[in-house]
């Protein structure tokens, strides 16, 4: 297999549980880049939440690609946008009003700033720190919002997340979907946005056969990417549905599962 792209989910895949990239994983991926393989960071985070990792992996030097918002925005490492898909403002406001009745903390962003109704809300500080972004507290989000976001992020008690997800799913129109991206996160996107479509679009833009790609992931929203890639690899810590959707599994995110798999496949 002529591997030309390695697509990487971030949290629970590329980073360990302390949100760090190990030296072994870092060295392995830079070695792959030096062999001409392009890296794709595939995350639900805003692009700015990927910049630190981009720099650690020297991706701008090697032509890497950033897939942010679960595939809703794709850019090169210099910030040039290939495409962006956002939610409509009217529908977003309607959803925000519906969410006021549910036990969730709502976070929206414009790529530069997070906006919430309560800075002390569940996981708000965590999300700001994780993405190295500031947070602005506004009144009522539905009344205040003046732009069309790419997604709506919801922090939810893990004990209630499946029930809340089902309530939201039943409310959303056909062209929107809600997915779990962590034990405590739900995210609402346009249905046509997913990491698998994003990977296919990147390969089309770069004129690379998607069969010459490898993807790593651990969560429900990684499944389309794992299925689209030539080889989809689930981390040991992945959810069972993710493992079933993948071609193979590797060690966990705390055990350098990425370099382990790349060496097993003779990529590096």
Regions found by a protein language model. Give the residues of each.
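Short active-site oxyanion
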Residues: 36-40, 62-64, 151, 211-212, ...
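Asp-based phosphoryl-transfer active-site loop
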Residues: 2-18
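Short, structured coil segments at secondary-structure junctions
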Residues: 62, 70, 171-174, 228-229, ...
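A generic "binding-loop/recognition-motif" signal
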Residues: 46, 70, 111-112, 184, ...
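Hydrophobic packing residues within well-ordered alpha-helices of enzyme cores
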Residues: 25, 50-54, 164, 168, ...
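Conserved acidic, metal-coordinating active-site core of Asp-based
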Residues: 98, 102-216, 237
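Active-site phosphate-binding/coordination module
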Residues: 23-123
């Amino acid at each position: 297999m002529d591997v030309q792209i390695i697509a990487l989910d971030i949290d629970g895949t590329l980073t360990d549980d302390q949100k760090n990239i190990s030296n072994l994983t870092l060295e392995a991926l830079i070695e792959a880049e030096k062999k001409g393989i392009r890296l794709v960071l595939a995350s639900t985070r805003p692009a700015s939440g990927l910049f630190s990792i981009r720099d650690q992996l020297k991706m701008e030097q090697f032509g890497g690609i950033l897939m942010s918002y679960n595939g809703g925005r794709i850019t090169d490492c210099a910030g040039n946008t290939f495409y962006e898909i956002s939610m409509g403002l009217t529908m977003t406001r309607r959803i925000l009003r519906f969410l006021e009745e549910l036990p969730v903390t709502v976070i929206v962003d414009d790529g530069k700033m997070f906006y919430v109704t309560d800075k002390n809300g569940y996981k708000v500080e965590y999300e700001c720190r994780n993405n190295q972004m500031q947070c602005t507290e506004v009144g009522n989000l539905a009344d205040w919002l003046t732009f069309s976001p790419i997604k709506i992020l919801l922090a939810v008690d893990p004990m209630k997340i499946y029930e809340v997800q089902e309530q939201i799913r039943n409310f959303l129109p056909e062209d929107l979907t809600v997915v779990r991206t962590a034990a405590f996160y739900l995210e609402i996107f346009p249905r046509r946005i997913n990491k698998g479509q994003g990977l296919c679009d990147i390969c089309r833009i770069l004129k690379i056969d998607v069969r010459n790609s490898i993807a790593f992931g651990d969560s429900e929203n990684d499944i389309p990417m794992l299925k689209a890639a030539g080889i989809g690899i689930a981390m040991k810590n992945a959810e069972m549905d993710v493992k079933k959707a993948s071609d193979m599994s590797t060690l966990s995110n705390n055990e350098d599962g990425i370099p382990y798999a790349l060496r097993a496949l003779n990529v590096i």
